[in-house]
Amino acid sequence: PTRRSSDLYVASVKTFGLKREDFLAIVDGMEMDVPQDIRAPDLATLDLYCDRVASAVGRLSVRVFGLPEDDGIQLAHHLGRALQLTNILRDIDEDAGLGRLYLPREWLWHAGITNNDPARVTADRALPKVCAPLAERAKMHFQKSDEIMERNSRRAVRAPRIMSKYYRAILDLLIARGFAAPRAPVRVSKAAKIGILLRYAII
Protein backbone atom coordinates (compact mmCIF):
# COMPACT_ATOMS: atom_id res chain seq x y z
CA PRO A 1 0.00 0.00 0.00
CA THR A 2 1.05 3.59 -0.56
CA ARG A 3 1.89 5.91 2.30
CA ARG A 4 -1.37 7.81 1.73
CA SER A 5 -3.53 4.68 1.79
CA SER A 6 -1.79 3.54 4.98
CA ASP A 7 -2.44 6.92 6.57
CA LEU A 8 -6.11 6.75 5.58
CA TYR A 9 -6.38 3.24 7.04
CA VAL A 10 -4.87 4.31 10.36
CA ALA A 11 -7.09 7.40 10.48
CA SER A 12 -10.22 5.32 9.80
CA VAL A 13 -9.30 2.78 12.46
CA LYS A 14 -8.86 5.54 15.03
CA THR A 15 -11.92 7.55 13.98
CA PHE A 16 -14.42 4.69 13.89
CA GLY A 17 -12.86 2.29 16.39
CA LEU A 18 -12.38 -0.44 13.79
CA LYS A 19 -11.06 -3.72 15.17
CA ARG A 20 -7.88 -5.31 13.83
CA GLU A 21 -9.32 -8.78 14.38
CA ASP A 22 -12.18 -8.03 11.98
CA PHE A 23 -9.74 -7.15 9.20
CA LEU A 24 -7.84 -10.36 9.92
CA ALA A 25 -11.07 -12.37 9.94
CA ILE A 26 -11.84 -11.17 6.41
CA VAL A 27 -8.41 -12.32 5.24
CA ASP A 28 -8.90 -15.66 7.02
CA GLY A 29 -12.24 -16.09 5.24
CA MET A 30 -10.62 -15.53 1.86
CA GLU A 31 -7.89 -18.02 2.74
CA MET A 32 -10.47 -20.70 3.58
CA ASP A 33 -11.19 -20.89 -0.17
CA VAL A 34 -7.55 -20.90 -1.26
CA PRO A 35 -5.71 -24.01 0.06
CA GLN A 36 -8.42 -26.40 -1.09
CA ASP A 37 -11.92 -26.14 -2.44
CA ILE A 38 -14.53 -26.18 0.31
CA ARG A 39 -16.70 -29.27 0.11
CA ALA A 40 -19.55 -29.97 2.51
CA PRO A 41 -18.17 -28.25 5.63
CA ASP A 42 -19.67 -29.16 8.97
CA LEU A 43 -22.11 -26.65 10.44
CA ALA A 44 -19.52 -25.09 12.75
CA THR A 45 -17.08 -24.53 9.88
CA LEU A 46 -19.84 -23.12 7.67
CA ASP A 47 -20.82 -20.67 10.40
CA LEU A 48 -17.18 -19.65 10.88
CA TYR A 49 -16.87 -19.11 7.13
CA CYS A 50 -20.00 -16.91 7.11
CA ASP A 51 -18.62 -14.92 10.03
CA ARG A 52 -15.29 -14.32 8.34
CA VAL A 53 -16.46 -13.44 4.83
CA ALA A 54 -19.65 -11.55 5.73
CA SER A 55 -20.20 -10.72 9.39
CA ALA A 56 -16.65 -9.40 9.86
CA VAL A 57 -17.28 -6.92 7.04
CA GLY A 58 -20.50 -5.97 8.79
CA ARG A 59 -18.73 -5.39 12.10
CA LEU A 60 -16.44 -2.90 10.39
CA SER A 61 -19.31 -1.24 8.52
CA VAL A 62 -21.70 -0.74 11.44
CA ARG A 63 -19.06 1.22 13.33
CA VAL A 64 -18.82 3.59 10.38
CA PHE A 65 -22.62 3.84 10.21
CA GLY A 66 -22.70 4.92 13.86
CA LEU A 67 -24.78 2.13 15.37
CA PRO A 68 -24.54 1.42 19.11
CA GLU A 69 -21.85 -1.17 19.84
CA ASP A 70 -24.08 -4.05 20.97
CA ASP A 71 -26.72 -3.59 18.29
CA GLY A 72 -24.03 -3.12 15.65
CA ILE A 73 -22.31 -6.39 16.54
CA GLN A 74 -25.61 -8.28 16.61
CA LEU A 75 -26.73 -6.77 13.32
CA ALA A 76 -23.43 -7.75 11.70
CA HIS A 77 -23.82 -11.27 13.09
CA HIS A 78 -27.34 -11.85 11.79
CA LEU A 79 -27.34 -9.86 8.56
CA GLY A 80 -23.92 -11.17 7.52
CA ARG A 81 -25.09 -14.74 7.90
CA ALA A 82 -28.41 -14.02 6.17
CA LEU A 83 -26.62 -12.54 3.16
CA GLN A 84 -23.99 -15.27 2.93
CA LEU A 85 -26.47 -18.14 3.26
CA THR A 86 -28.54 -16.52 0.52
CA ASN A 87 -25.40 -16.31 -1.63
CA ILE A 88 -24.72 -20.00 -1.03
CA LEU A 89 -28.25 -20.99 -2.03
CA ARG A 90 -28.19 -18.75 -5.09
CA ASP A 91 -24.77 -19.92 -6.30
CA ILE A 92 -25.07 -23.68 -5.75
CA ASP A 93 -24.50 -24.56 -9.40
CA GLU A 94 -21.87 -21.90 -10.04
CA ASP A 95 -19.90 -23.02 -6.98
CA ALA A 96 -20.20 -26.66 -8.03
CA GLY A 97 -18.63 -25.73 -11.36
CA LEU A 98 -15.65 -24.42 -9.37
CA GLY A 99 -15.44 -27.61 -7.33
CA ARG A 100 -16.99 -26.04 -4.24
CA LEU A 101 -19.90 -27.13 -2.09
CA TYR A 102 -20.91 -25.00 0.89
CA LEU A 103 -23.96 -27.00 1.99
CA PRO A 104 -23.51 -28.41 5.52
CA ARG A 105 -22.30 -31.99 5.80
CA GLU A 106 -24.68 -32.96 8.59
CA TRP A 107 -27.74 -31.90 6.61
CA LEU A 108 -26.50 -33.68 3.48
CA TRP A 109 -26.12 -36.89 5.46
CA HIS A 110 -29.56 -36.42 7.03
CA ALA A 111 -31.01 -36.17 3.52
CA GLY A 112 -29.21 -39.38 2.53
CA ILE A 113 -26.52 -37.65 0.45
CA THR A 114 -23.17 -39.13 1.46
CA ASN A 115 -21.15 -38.13 -1.61
CA ASN A 116 -19.34 -34.79 -1.44
CA ASP A 117 -18.67 -34.40 -5.17
CA PRO A 118 -20.32 -31.03 -5.98
CA ALA A 119 -21.61 -32.09 -9.41
CA ARG A 120 -23.25 -35.23 -8.04
CA VAL A 121 -24.67 -33.49 -4.99
CA THR A 122 -26.25 -30.68 -6.99
CA ALA A 123 -27.95 -33.24 -9.26
CA ASP A 124 -29.28 -35.32 -6.35
CA ARG A 125 -33.07 -35.44 -6.02
CA ALA A 126 -32.78 -35.06 -2.25
CA LEU A 127 -31.00 -31.70 -2.48
CA PRO A 128 -34.16 -29.66 -1.67
CA LYS A 129 -34.22 -31.39 1.74
CA VAL A 130 -30.90 -29.67 2.47
CA CYS A 131 -31.62 -26.30 0.88
CA ALA A 132 -35.05 -25.76 2.45
CA PRO A 133 -33.81 -25.71 6.08
CA LEU A 134 -30.84 -23.58 5.06
CA ALA A 135 -33.29 -21.09 3.56
CA GLU A 136 -35.25 -21.14 6.82
CA ARG A 137 -32.07 -20.39 8.74
CA ALA A 138 -31.38 -17.44 6.42
CA LYS A 139 -34.95 -16.18 7.00
CA MET A 140 -34.40 -16.38 10.76
CA HIS A 141 -31.27 -14.25 10.48
CA PHE A 142 -33.11 -11.73 8.29
CA GLN A 143 -35.86 -11.50 10.91
CA LYS A 144 -33.37 -10.95 13.73
CA SER A 145 -31.57 -8.25 11.76
CA ASP A 146 -34.89 -6.54 10.97
CA GLU A 147 -35.72 -6.42 14.68
CA ILE A 148 -32.39 -4.72 15.41
CA MET A 149 -32.78 -2.21 12.58
CA GLU A 150 -36.31 -1.30 13.68
CA ARG A 151 -35.06 0.01 17.01
CA ASN A 152 -32.28 2.15 15.51
CA SER A 153 -32.35 5.40 13.58
CA ARG A 154 -33.34 5.16 9.94
CA ARG A 155 -30.19 6.98 8.88
CA ALA A 156 -27.84 4.62 10.75
CA VAL A 157 -29.37 1.51 9.18
CA ARG A 158 -30.03 2.84 5.68
CA ALA A 159 -27.26 0.87 3.94
CA PRO A 160 -27.77 -2.43 5.80
CA ARG A 161 -31.53 -2.20 5.31
CA ILE A 162 -31.13 -1.80 1.55
CA MET A 163 -28.83 -4.83 1.45
CA SER A 164 -31.26 -6.78 3.61
CA LYS A 165 -34.28 -6.03 1.44
CA TYR A 166 -32.43 -6.80 -1.79
CA TYR A 167 -31.05 -10.12 -0.57
CA ARG A 168 -34.34 -11.08 1.07
CA ALA A 169 -35.97 -10.56 -2.33
CA ILE A 170 -33.41 -12.96 -3.82
CA LEU A 171 -34.12 -15.51 -1.09
CA ASP A 172 -37.87 -15.27 -1.67
CA LEU A 173 -37.34 -15.87 -5.39
CA LEU A 174 -35.16 -18.91 -4.64
CA ILE A 175 -37.77 -20.38 -2.32
CA ALA A 176 -40.55 -19.77 -4.86
CA ARG A 177 -38.46 -21.42 -7.61
CA GLY A 178 -37.45 -24.39 -5.49
CA PHE A 179 -34.12 -26.18 -5.31
CA ALA A 180 -34.64 -29.25 -7.47
CA ALA A 181 -32.54 -29.54 -10.62
CA PRO A 182 -32.55 -27.96 -13.12
CA ARG A 183 -32.40 -24.62 -11.33
CA ALA A 184 -33.01 -21.49 -13.40
CA PRO A 185 -31.12 -18.39 -12.22
CA VAL A 186 -33.20 -15.87 -10.27
CA ARG A 187 -32.96 -12.12 -10.63
CA VAL A 188 -34.61 -9.27 -8.78
CA SER A 189 -36.49 -7.17 -11.31
CA LYS A 190 -35.40 -3.64 -12.09
CA ALA A 191 -38.75 -2.37 -10.79
CA ALA A 192 -38.21 -4.16 -7.47
CA LYS A 193 -34.69 -2.74 -7.17
CA ILE A 194 -35.98 0.78 -7.81
CA GLY A 195 -38.74 0.24 -5.27
CA ILE A 196 -36.22 -0.75 -2.60
CA LEU A 197 -34.07 2.29 -3.30
CA LEU A 198 -37.03 4.66 -3.31
CA ARG A 199 -38.39 3.31 -0.05
CA TYR A 200 -35.20 2.95 1.95
CA ALA A 201 -32.60 5.25 0.38
CA ILE A 202 -34.48 8.28 -0.83
CA ILE A 203 -37.87 8.67 0.83
Where do the language-model regions lie?
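Catalytic cores of Mg2+-dependent Asp-rich isoprenoid enzymes
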Residues: R3-Q84, L89, D93-I203
